[in-house]
Amino acid sequence: MLSPKRTRFRKQHRGRMKGISYRGNHISFGKYALQALEPAWITSRQIEAGRRAMTRNARRGGKIWVRIFPDKPVTLRPAETRMGSGKGSPEYWVAVVKPGRILYEMGGVTENIARRAISLAASKMPIRTQFIIS
């Protein structure tokens, strides 16, 4: 699973996901890509599940680039804990994804293989996505 080696602060505010993605919304490495159409937090487990699905489907052919990184810690309180007494401890990491953001890129394979592999990765994502070709 992806996570930062070290961060400046252990805990973060939740923030808001307004507007569309102005960065990371163009294909820069491969020829085919998966693009987000909705805003969401995508966990490191979901990113890894999508990556595994793509590599398994493409087998030895092609190269895959993961264009998002989970750099936001999500904190959780233990179950059956009373209110108050501070913020919970960091449990997992998420990538903040806005509409238009490229999630995965793929190159070195034919279009039908890429389309099949990327559709498998899309089924692992908690949002609507689209397949795009550069």
From Swiss-Prot:
Chain's gene name: rpl16
Complexes and interactors: Part of the 50S ribosomal subunit.
Keywords attached to this entry: Chloroplast, Plastid, Ribonucleoprotein, Ribosomal protein
Keyword Ribosomal protein part of the UniProt annotation: yes
Organism of this sequence: Atropa belladonna (Belladonna)
Stated name of the protein: Large ribosomal subunit protein uL16c
A family per Pfam: Ribosomal_L16
MF-aspect GO terms: rRNA binding; structural constituent of ribosome
Taxonomic superkingdom: Eukaryota
Entry GO terms, CC: chloroplast; mitochondrial large ribosomal subunit
GO BP, sorted A to Z: mitochondrial translation
Chief location category: plastid
PANTHER family for the chain: 50S/60S RIBOSOMAL PROTEIN L16, LARGE RIBOSOMAL SUBUNIT PROTEIN UL16M
Protein family (similarity comment): Belongs to the universal ribosomal protein uL16 family.
Compartments reported by the entry: Plastid, Chloroplast
